[in-house]
Amino acid sequence: SLVEVCEVDTPPGAEPIAWRLLTTHAVEDAAMTWRVVGWYRQRWHIEQFFRTLKQQGLQLEDSQLENAGRLIKLTAIAARAACTIMQLVQARDGRSGQDARIAFSLPESETLHALLPELEGKTELQKNPHPPETLAWAAWIIAKLGGWDGYPKSKPPGPITFRHGLQYFKSLAHGWRLRNV
């Protein structure tokens, strides 16, 4: 079956998005059409995950490990990091309202709180616009650590910015945990 989906209300000056999707499933009504579109949309997330894992951040393919067992362990660790990065990318706009605890532990959350005053500027435009303890709030902090300027008119942070920010954050969080040792 062929499913064709075209964007309506296209912004001025932009061409409408048109998808032509081939499926082996019988598409006999609108509900099934939207189910096929939903599957395609999920496929995009999966492709983004593997792009983050391999090329756009963690460079798993650059590993020089030759032992299969070690490569499997590295892949598992990298997959967890890629998953967190993708959660941050998807939460950055604040629409999901997800809790930061789905990606960060309580000690890491304390570190996020401690870092926030250092990352926010003096004006309202330079402050984290998201409710505290949400994943969008945490994503804003991680993106700032990754080099994003934080202004609403700037290009939104992507996987590479989040990878840099998350790597830096993990080091800071480890140091924060050791502060009372």
Please place each PLM-identified region on the residue numbering.
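Single, function-defining residue in the core of a domain
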Residues: 1-181
